[in-house]
Each structure stands twice: as C-alpha cells, then as structure tokens.
Design a protein with these regions (language model features):
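C-terminal transmembrane-bundle signature of multipass membrane proteins
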Residues: 1-46, 61-72
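Charged, low-complexity surface segments at secondary-structure and domain boundaries
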Residues: 12-16, 42-49, 95-102, 136-139
Length: 170
C-alpha cells in the first residue's frame, strides 16, 4: 500500500516533466530563430532545477525577443527612409493612433499565425521574394482568453508548424 502512495506522489512530477518536454519541443524553433537575431537576450545565469522552470525561462526569452523585434519593426514602419536616406521628422505632439493598439478582430490562432509568418519570413535564408512586413503592435497583444504562457506557446506552435510544413517534415 505504501508503494502506491509513493508512486502517486511522483505522478505530478512525471506529468510536469513530460509536459515541459513537449513545450520545449514546441518553442525550440522560435527560440532558435529569435536567439540568432538577438543573441544578447538572456545573457546571464540560466536557471537550474526542474525542467518546467527552464522552459518558463526560455518562454521569457521569446517574449523579450518578440518585444525587441516588434519595437524595431514598428519604429522602421513609422520612420520610412526617403530616396536621399533621410528620415522624416515627427511633429511635436504627434501621437500614435490608439486604434493601432487594439487587438485585431481575428481568432487567436490566426493572430498567432500572422506573427509566426512575420518572424518566419524574416528568418536567415528566407527567399528574397518573401514579404516580412510587420503586421503591427496590436497583433502581438495577448488575447484575453490566453495566459502569457499559452500565448507564447500558441505563437511558437504556429511557427513550428510553418517550419515543419515548409521543410516537408509534416
């Protein structure tokens, strides 16, 4: 009877480990691409301990790198360079359109797929005719029905599906 109790107490740890392994496989392609683009994100001590902690840290790195990508892309989109290489000046008091920050009226999976396609189109070795146009900051906004973790996982899942379908491994 005692061994049943002991085995039962280990079950949550085993479930966490298998869940974390699955999540790690899901986020790895996106983490690799964003890590290539932003090698300085996440410099420092890596957490040791349960795999779920390490997965959470990697999700945090993805979130940080997505923020950096989006900030740079949004700035470039709002500050186009003219033929002379000069950037237009912004008028004092000019503000961004608030509607640009509202969540897009699409299902969360489509929203995540759009973000994944934007990252995928800008990857190293992407065909020159691939359009890597930034969809806008609103597309990165987490849907209300998703937690932070679920949202990063959804984007990573959509990115992983793109890499698998375009490499013929599906």
């Amino acid at each position: 009877m005692m061994w049943v109790c002991n085995a039962g107490s280990l079950l949550p740890s085993v479930e966490d480990w298998f869940g974390a392994r699955h999540e790690l496989r899901t986020i790895q392609p996106l983490l690799t691409e964003l890590g290539r683009r932003h090698p300085d994100v996440g410099i420092g001590v890596r957490p040791r301990g349960p795999l779920v902690f390490r997965v959470a840290e990697r999700m945090s790195l993805i979130s940080d790198a997505l923020f950096l990508e989006a900030t740079a892309a949004d700035a470039a989109r709002k500050r186009p360079v003219d033929a002379t290489g000069a950037r237009p000046t912004r008028e004092p008091g000019e503000t961004d359109d608030v509607s640009e920050l509202e969540s897009p009226p699409v299902p969360p999976q489509e929203q995540a797929r759009t973000i994944a396609q934007w990252i995928y189109a800008g990857r190293e070795g992407a065909p020159k005719d691939t359009n890597a146009e930034f969809p806008g900051l609103a597309w990165l906004r987490q849907p209300t029905s998703y937690s932070d973790r679920e949202w990063i996982l959804e984007i990573a899942q959509q990115y992983r599906l793109l890499t698998l379908s375009n490499s013929g491994s599906v």
